[in-house]
Amino acid sequence: ANRKINDNLQQQVSVLYQSWFENFELSNGICPENWSCQELSTIANIASGKRPPLKSEVCNQETPIPIVGAASIMGFTSESNHRDKILVTGRVGTHGVVQRFNSPCWTSDNTLVITSPFYEFTNQILCRIDYSSMNRGSTQPLITQGDMKKVIVLIPDEETLAKFEEFAGSLMARWEKNCDENIKLALLRDTLLPKLMSGELDVSAIEI
């Protein structure tokens, strides 16, 4: 149920962005004169990830921190290189997957890490970039920091941008809460299921 709700929340934010910043429905279909095309680096900081100090396939007390790869979690390590709210996309290998993190993690050296005071607006931009046109690699796909910084985007006035962040942020706060609940439920399942299968946990006396 949470996954369906989250899909709907993401879709609502995407439709809102399209309505305001692509179809210009706030201004009768015309781009306002006080909006301007600028480089992505004017609203976002873009950096590369780093190679983790160690890598484990298992999440435990020694390696509790997820290592973020170009498209997904690729392992676990002992320390974080980010504790802030970040957006992550692939630098080497897989391109076009945008990941959100708001908890300690280690962004690997095949990622680009994006931070911005306009987090939700920047997220929508990243989800719409044509990454294939930026690829510099021949045998292995590669996108550079410099190319990402120079992506031209339409920047609205501060008031409109703040309103979008408020609306989109409230929807995505619900999304994050649902994601946290899904993780807790998965951990509970993974803890209880082996005990049920082995008979260690007896539920025969429970009335349903």
What spans do the regions from the language model cover?
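Non-catalytic DNA-recognition/assembly elements of restriction-modification systems
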Residues: 1-68, 154, 158-204
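DNA target-recognition domains and sequence-specific DNA-contacting regions of bacterial/archaeal
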Residues: 31-32, 36-158, 207-208
